[in-house]
From Swiss-Prot:
Lineage: Bacteria, Pseudomonadati, Aquificota, Aquificia, Aquificales
GO cellular component, one term: cytosol
Family, per entry: Belongs to the alanine racemase family.
SMART domains given in the database record: Ala_racemase_C (SM01005)
Protein name as it appears in the record: Alanine racemase
Pfam families linked to this entry: Ala_racemase_C, Ala_racemase_N
Organism: Aquifex aeolicus (strain VF5)
Function statement: Catalyzes the interconversion of L-alanine and D-alanine. May also act on other amino acids.
Residues annotated as binding substrate: R126, M284
Length: 338
């Protein structure tokens, strides 16, 4: 029996994707790169492939695309990170769709019968052509990426720049730019949205207008319960000392599992709705909490993330972003689709 479980609510995942599609009026390219942000790319692909709102998946590299194909995923798979020369045979064999964002990607493909999308850099300074038009019948789609979707003024400049590029193309099947946060702009000339974080019910912006619901629950077992005397040091470096006789618990979840050490002495875990303050430094495999007057006992589940606190809220406490927390989730956490 695993000591830590990440529950993925399939009904809510599908609800969120349908609401995102409904809000935008567009089909969805589901971004499941980096093992679906640490949640599980195979699990996510199998949840989403059956629904009509999802038109394709997007991953970072060829290896991620091959893995999905080997697990039976049939829908189109975009390779966001492009394609290098030695990867082209796998792209052909597994019917993957590379995103061309550098002239070397185009040269790698050569004259092979491989459809591709062209990416434009409209203000990210990362991957993408600046303004070159690729006149090639194999171009299936064109795309860009919003660098600062919370910045309305700059995002609108990017959208305008991309629109001018789009006008230079004819008969392009797929045009996409909006991310989970970017859907708020309802770009009129795109055909698809490209979303990741919001699928999990994580709201990327304040006052997010899409009706999404938290779909992830992260819980770990309580493996020890005891009472510590007053003035007793807790954890490495003795950064916490009990102020009175205190009932404490040890939870089988530490920074090796993805609970950032920056949360030591400043955050909490949850038990039956009760906030359990973290005492002392979070350690590699365990975290010590104040059990207060709860009835918690060894073997009970303690919650890191649930409906009461999302990854977005936990990330805010840790001084980071939810993507980093999710991507850092350990492989020893069992992923369970419910």
């Amino acid at each position: 029996m695993p000591r830590a479980i990440l529950e993925i609510n399939s009904e809510r995942i599908r609800h969120n994707v349908k609401k995102l599609s409904e809000f935008s009026g567009k089909k969805v390219i589901a971004v499941i790169k980096a093992d679906a942000y640490g949640i599980g790319s195979i699990q996510m692909a199998k949840i989403l492939e059956p629904i009509e709102e999802v038109d394709a998946f997007a991953v970072a590299c060829v290896e991620e695309g091959v893995e999905l194909r080997k697990m039976g995923i049939k829908k189109e798979i975009l390779i966001l990170g492009g394609v290098l020369k030695d990867e082209v045979p796998l792209v052909e064999e597994y019917f993957l769709t590379p995103v061309v964002s550098d002239i070397e990607h185009l040269r790698a493909i050569g004259n092979r019968d491989i459809k591709f999308h062209v990416k434009y850099d409209t203000g990210m300074g990362r991957l993408g052509f600046l303004n070159e038009v690729i006149h090639d019948p194999r171009v299936e789609g064109i795309m860009s990426h919003l660098s600062s979707p919370a910045d309305e003024e700059f995002s609108k400049l990017q959208i305008k720049k991309f629109e001018e590029i789009v006008k230079k193309y004819t008969k392009v099947e797929k045009i996409h730019m909006e991310s989970s946060a970017g859907v708020v702009y309802r770009v009129p000339f795109t055909t698809h949205i490209r979303v990741g974080l919001a699928m999990y019910g994580e709201k990327p912006l304040k006052n997010y207008p899409v009706d999404i619901k938290p779909a992830l629950t992260l819980k770990a077992k309580l493996i020890s319960v005891k009472e510590l005397p007053e003035n007793y040091p807790v954890s490495y470096s003795r950064t916490y000392v009990t102020k009175k006789k205190t009932k404490t618990g040890v939870v089988a979840f530490g920074y090796a599992d993805g609970l950032m050490k920056t949360l030591s002495n400043r955050s909490y875990l949850l038990y039956k709705g009760e906030k359990l303050p973290i005492f002392g430094n979070i350690t590699m495999d365990m975290t010590i909490v104040d059990l207060k007057n709860t009835d918690a006992k060894v073997g009970d589940w303690v919650y890191v993330v649930n409906e009461e606190r999302t990854f977005t809220e936990l990330a805010r406490e840790a001084g980071t972003i939810p993507y980093e927390l999710m991507c850092n989730l350990s492989k020893r956490i069992k992923r369970v689709v419910v």
